[in-house]
Amino acid sequence: MLPLSLLKTAQNHPMLVELKNGETYNGHLVSCDNWMNINLREVICTSRDGDKFWRMPECYIRGSTIKYLRIPDEIIDMVKEEVVAKGRGRGGLQQQKQQKGRGMGGAGRGVFGGRGRGGIPGTGRGQPEKKPGRQAGKQ
């Protein structure tokens, strides 16, 4: 289960977010993006000491400041059910496809099948293609 798929499923559900500086935010998840930046609504912010509280209608939290997220167990169960329903876990699709990696034979990535010299002779850097029967410089 990937963290971002968990967050996408948790939209419109309550969650607790603790930041690296010790502050906590309790609210309902509105949205999240690929960098785990999140928007919360109906937020209660608690100071790191736990002695001050603020109520906010909405709040934006940068993903890189998050220490951890506490999400209800029912959300985790929903994500597990989605993974089973899709029938894919780690490597599910890759095992069905033909894999072309190291040691699997085939031509690989290069056109001529290897490294170094051994391509078409006479086509070096900036040199015209050599044609038999003509000398360079004489017309």
From Swiss-Prot:
CDD domains: LSm4
Region of interest (Disordered), ranges: 87-139
Residue numbers bearing the N-acetylmethionine modification: 1
Compartments it resides in: Nucleus
Principal subcellular localization: nucleus
Segments forming domain Sm: 2-75
Molecular function GO terms recorded: PH domain binding; RNA binding; U6 snRNA binding
Coiled coil (UniProt feature): none
Biased composition (Gly residues): 102-125
Alphabetic keyword roster: Acetylation, Isopeptide bond, mRNA processing, mRNA splicing, Nucleus, Ribonucleoprotein, RNA-binding, Spliceosome, Ubl conjugation
InterPro entries in the record: Lsm4, LSm4/Sm_D1/D3, LSM_dom_sf, Sm, Sm_dom_euk/arc
Family named by the database record: Belongs to the snRNP Sm proteins family.
Function: Plays a role in pre-mRNA splicing as component of the U4/U6-U5 tri-snRNP complex that is involved in spliceosome assembly, and as component of the precatalytic spliceosome (spliceosome B complex). The heptameric LSM2-8 complex binds specifically to the 3'-terminal U-tract of U6 snRNA.
Name this polypeptide is given: U6 snRNA-associated Sm-like protein LSm4
Phylogenetic placement of the source organism: Eukaryota, Metazoa, Chordata, Craniata, Vertebrata
Record gene name: LSM4
